[in-house]
């Protein structure tokens, strides 16, 4: 809703800020729905370009998390709000403590993977150039370095799982505020989930058909188009299977870009949800597995971006790179899910499998991958193969079709 221009006012209740009179001001890169500036490296002001009437999710969530003492986010200091002549309130900006950081987890992951691949390339070239007696030693050293690099990557991805789990536990705690606490999924929630998946999947399949017509045959696209009705029915069944699941407030737009890397720990930011969605929908309690799906897809995306990136390799070098990326993807996804499940104290299943509701998680993974197809079709068609592969993978799992097994491959070519 637009804020009326007449008879409006903006009220500010002074709050002491730890700022020097000559504190430096730094504008950060503009995001989709907001612009931010850092003042004195102690305060960050987020200005919303999409002003909406009523309770703003970012303000509501950060205020609640600050009140209950959730540590791994930027604490709320205050807000700048507009109030119309009729008493309708709109948040124009929020003021938060600044978290000193080394950047977001998306950039960190890209840099980490790129560095690891470059180092592997140097080592494998040395192996190829070495004599027969030295080759086994060089191979052993290369494998050790790769294992150490993987351990470092998994340590931080595991921290994200822990912090997200702690966030969900905090948001599920009993509260005097009815906007928080938990609920139970009912038929309306299942219908809502089904409708969202139907909306995204239908559009995605239409985009894929058009993309294939312009780019030539693609086996994944052919298969997905042939399974349209079966996928929609499988999504409906998964949504109904979620009846009785716990609901709560969630982050709502969780991915690696919403995580700050700070002194080796993970800080979660940007709680406004998907900006294009209606505010009431963003504030609705839903399954926390929606956030989990967002991060799982983001882990896949960063690997896809590495394959899609400017590094042009071919032949054995490409095969080694792809094996390494697949190993990192499989291991990081498993570590994230394990640490998340441990943080929420999810009871293990009888067969020792993942303690989370994987059927419901797959529903949200399907929706997220379809959303990504729609986004790339509209904005970056050359990136569309990344979500296409993810959509085909989760769709095959939903329909119990043949899915290539995830194998921990040695990037140097032999068994791990």
Positions of predicted regions on the chain:
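An alpha-helical support segment within catalytic cores of ATP-dependent transferases
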Residues: 7-23, 204-249
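Conserved ATP-binding subdomain of kinase catalytic cores across diverse folds
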Residues: 1-210, 256, 262-354
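Short amphipathic alpha-helical interaction patches enriched in hydrophobic/aromatic residues
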Residues: 212, 279, 374-377
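ATP/Mg2+ or Mg2+-diphosphate-binding catalytic cores
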Residues: 219, 313, 320-349, 360-416
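Conserved catalytic-loop position in the HRD/HxD motif
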Residues: 253
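Charged, amphipathic alpha-helical oligomerization/scaffolding segments
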Residues: 159, 166, 196, 223-230, ...
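A structural signal for well-ordered alpha-helices, especially hydrophobic packing surfaces
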Residues: 168-171, 201, 205, 232-236, ...
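Acidic, serine/threonine- and proline-rich low-complexity regulatory regions
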Residues: 239-242, 249, 277, 346-360
């Amino acid at each position: 809703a637009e804020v009326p221009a007449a008879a409006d006012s903006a009220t500010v209740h002074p709050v002491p800020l730890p700022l020097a009179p000559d504190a430096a001001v730094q504008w950060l890169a503009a995001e989709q729905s907001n612009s931010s500036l850092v003042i004195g490296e102690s305060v960050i002001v987020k200005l919303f370009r999409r002003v909406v009437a009523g309770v703003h999710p970012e303000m509501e969530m950060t205020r609640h998390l600050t009140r209950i003492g959730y540590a791994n986010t930027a604490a709320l200091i205050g807000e700048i709000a507009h109030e119309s002549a009729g008493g309708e309130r709109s948040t124009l900006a929020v003021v938060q403590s600044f978290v000193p950081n080394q950047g977001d987890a998306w950039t960190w992951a890209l840099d980490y993977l790129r560095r690891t691949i470059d180092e592997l390339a140097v080592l494998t070239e040395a192996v190829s150039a070495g004599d027969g007696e030295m080759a086994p030693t060089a191979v052993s050293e290369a494998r050790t370095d790769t294992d150490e690099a993987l351990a470092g990557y998994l340590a931080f991805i595991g921290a994200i799982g822990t912090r997200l789990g702690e966030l969900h536990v905090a948001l599920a705690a009993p509260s005097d505020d009815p906007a928080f606490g938990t609920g139970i999924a009912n038929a309306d929630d299942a219908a809502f989930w089904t409708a969202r998946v139907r909306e995204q999947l239908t559009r995605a399949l239409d985009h894929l058909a058009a993309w294939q017509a312009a780019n030539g045959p693609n086996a994944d696209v052919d298969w997905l188009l042939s399974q349209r009705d079966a996928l929609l029915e499988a999504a409906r069944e998964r949504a109904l299977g979620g009846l009785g699941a716990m609901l709560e407030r969630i982050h709502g737009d969780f991915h690696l870009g919403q995580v700050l890397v700070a002194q080796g720990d993970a800080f979660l930011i940007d709680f406004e949800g998907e900006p294009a969605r209606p505010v009431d929908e963003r504030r609705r309690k839903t399954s926390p597995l929606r956030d989990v799906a967002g991060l799982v897809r983001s882990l896949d995306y960063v690997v896809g971006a590495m394959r899609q990136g400017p590094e042009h390799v071919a032949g054995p070098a490409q095969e080694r790179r792809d094996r390494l990326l697949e190993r990192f993807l499989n291991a990081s996804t498993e570590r994230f899910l394990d640490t998340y499940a441990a943080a929420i104290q999810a009871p293990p299943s009888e067969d020792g499998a993942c303690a989370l509701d994987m059927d419901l998680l797959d529903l949200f993974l399907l929706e997220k991958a379809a959303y990504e197809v729609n986004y790339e079709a509209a904005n970056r068609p050359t990136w569309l193969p990344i979500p296409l592969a993810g959509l085909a993978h989760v769709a095959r799992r939903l329909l119990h079709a043949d899915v290539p097994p995830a194998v921990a491959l040695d990037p140097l070519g032999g068994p791990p």
